[in-house]
A protein has these predicted regions:
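Active-site neighborhood of phospho(di)ester-bond hydrolases with catalytic His/Asp-centered motifs
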Residues: 32-36, 53-64, 89-90, 168-171, ...
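Structured loop/turn residues at beta-strand edges in well-structured enzyme cores
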Residues: 48-51, 124-127, 184, 207
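Binuclear metal-ion centers of metallo-dependent hydrolases, dominated by the metallo-beta-lactamase
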Residues: 176-188, 196-245
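Active-site metal-binding motif and surrounding structural segment of the metallo-beta-lactamase
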Residues: 38-88
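Core dinuclear metal-dependent hydrolase active-site scaffold
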Residues: 1-46, 118-178, 241-245
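Acidic/polar short surface loop at catalytic or gating sites that assists cofactor/ion binding
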Residues: 84-86, 91-121, 132-142
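P-loop/Walker A phosphate-binding loop and immediately adjacent motor/lid segment at beta-alpha junctions
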Residues: 72-86, 148-154, 201-223
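Hydrophobic packing residues within well-ordered alpha-helices of enzyme cores
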Residues: 43, 69-72, 96-101, 179, ...
Length: 245
């Protein structure tokens, strides 16, 4: 299994990093997880052909993980893709379709079938991929309740099983505790270092994880405690590098 990080930046755009997006290749499958801004351009840079993607996963509805998806779909349409494309969404697929319609982007016009599924259904289509709920969006509970909004606060981490073990893409999280049962026996973890408190990241060195890749920025507290990150285990995400798992 191969991991390529297309975007490792935080929600605030930076000149030297792209927004969240990763490619996972296993045997004949190619999966795109999250589609931050410029994702379509990044796929072109990596020479990903129109027919090559098997599925796209969106872990949660924040713009830095989602807003590139619309251009990816438009690109695949204009490239005359024919093969069915699975799109796994975190919540409320009907609302997503309304946004497509707002943009005058109609799946009915695509030359391929866009098969929209709930992200919980991943295992039904790929026996080596499953989604785990996390705590990233719980902080919105009060405003959702106050204004009676339809948001469901669903945010997900993704697990991919390979020959050497399990790869976990945490996506955005508030704590590592919320998915610790999933993390502790992983081979490689791509972990959000921009939201959790420093101790939540540092304590991962006491698990059996072989490699911990820090992405999505870094908190000031973790920056101050970088000397506690064992360089044999921890490293900062490098875009365009192919990681073997």
């Amino acid at each position: 299994m191969e991991l390529t990080i297309l975007g490792s930046g935080p929600g605030l755009p930076q000149l030297d990093k792209h927004l969240s997006s990763i490619l996972i290749r296993k045997e004949n499958n190619l999966i795109l997880a999250d589609c931050g801004d410029s994702c379509a351009h990044r796929l072109l840079e990596h020479k990903v052909a129109a027919e090559e993607l098997d599925a796209i996963f969106i872990t949660h509805y924040h713009p830095d993980h989602l807003d590139g998806l619309f251009m990816v779909l438009q690109m695949l349409y204009l490239q005359n893709r024919k093969r069915d494309l699975l799109l796994f969404l975190p919540e409320r697929p009907a609302s997503f379709l309304e946004i497509l319609q707002l943009m005058y982007t109609y799946p009915q016009k695509f030359g391929f079938n866009l098969l929209i599924r709930d992200i919980e259904q991943a295992e039904l289509y790929f026996d080596w991929i499953y989604a785990v709920p996390n705590d990233h969006l719980y902080r919105y509970a009060s405003i959702i309740s106050e204004y009676h909004l339809p948001n469901q606060m669903k945010s997900w981490s993704l697990c991919f099983t390979g020959k050497q073990g399990k790869f976990v893409y945490t996506s955005d999280i508030e704590t590592t505790d919320c998915i610790m049962d999933t993390l502790k026996d992983a081979h490689t973890v791509l972990v959000d270092a921009g939201h959790p408190e420093a101790e939540q990241i540092i304590k991962l060195k006491y698990t059996a994880i072989k490699k911990i890749i820090l992405t999505h920025g870094i908190t000031p507290e973790l920056e101050d405690r970088k000397d506690e990150l064992n360089p044999e285990i921890f490293e900062f995400a490098r875009e365009d590098v192919v990681y073997q798992i």
